[in-house]
């Protein structure tokens, strides 16, 4: 189990809005030192100014490996270590059918949702290994386990690939580095601008009945950094819904 440092140094990608900004606000309130990164610098700086405590702003494109290296280097230069790295950056896409997904669509989803997180894993895990501890958090989606929203098929597939990378790394580290915690977060619909920002547009997530508040999701993630399940469903009915889906597919 990862050691809970006080206060932790936390890197958050995709921190300019949505779940990433919510996590930053929640952890700042708990006294964490933060490194916030996203492409939208004005939004990042506005968020940083609203937070208390030590905050480093690093505008970057996490689909570019050199940028991710730079985020890690800035974190180490400012704070001397990284305790938690949250791969939250990502984007959706809306297409009417699986058959309508183009090569470019799939490549964009893998770039934004899978490869960007892989870069984060590759740059921070060696640091965790050298220190003998750390927490890696990859934010996925319930759609990666229950791909019922077919208009999000390419998005769901890219997040399913992220799940596989996360679980493979977890297996790889559990015997050699038991104090490195690898957490997979599986949110449902969250009241953010995710739908509006999707390639091809989409329904406004904030108008979907039952959408979780960002603050609730951020609190659940913050509570689960250092203890609790490694597959972290932000909806209380998440595991039951996944199990029901598997049973349906299996015909049992």
Say what each PLM segment does.
Residues 184, 200-244:
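C-terminal helical subdomain
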């Amino acid at each position: 189990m990862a050691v809970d440092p006080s206060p932790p140094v936390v890197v958050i990608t995709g921190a300019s809005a949505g779940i990433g900004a919510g996590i930053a606000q929640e952890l700042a309130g708990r006294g964490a030192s933060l490194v916030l990164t996203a492409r939208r610098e004005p939004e990042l700086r506005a968020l940083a100014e609203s937070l208390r405590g030590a905050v480093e702003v690093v505008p970057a494109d996490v689909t570019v490996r050199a940028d991710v290296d730079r985020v890690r280097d800035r974190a180490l230069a400012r704070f001397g270590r990284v305790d938690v790295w949250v791969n939250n950056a990502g984007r959706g896409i809306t297409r009417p059918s699986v058959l309508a997904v183009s090569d470019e669509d799939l490549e964009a989803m893998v770039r934004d949702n899978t490869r960007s997180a892989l870069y984060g894993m590759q740059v921070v895990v060696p640091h965790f290994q050298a220190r003998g501890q750390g927490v890696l958090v990859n934010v996925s989606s319930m759609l990666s386990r229950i791909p019922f929203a077919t208009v999000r098929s390419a998005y769901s597939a890219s997040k399913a690939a992220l799940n596989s990378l996360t679980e493979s790394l977890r297996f790889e580290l559990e015997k050699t580095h038991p104090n490195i915690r690898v957490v997979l977060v599986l949110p449902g619909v969250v009241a953010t601008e995710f739908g509006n920002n999707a390639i091809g547009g989409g329904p406004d997530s904030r108008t979907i009945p039952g959408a979780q508040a960002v603050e609730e999701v951020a609190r659940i993630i913050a509570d689960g950094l250092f203890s609790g399940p490694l597959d972290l469903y932000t909806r209380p009915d998440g595991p039951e819904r996944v199990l029901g889906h598997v049973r349906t597919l299996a015909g049992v």
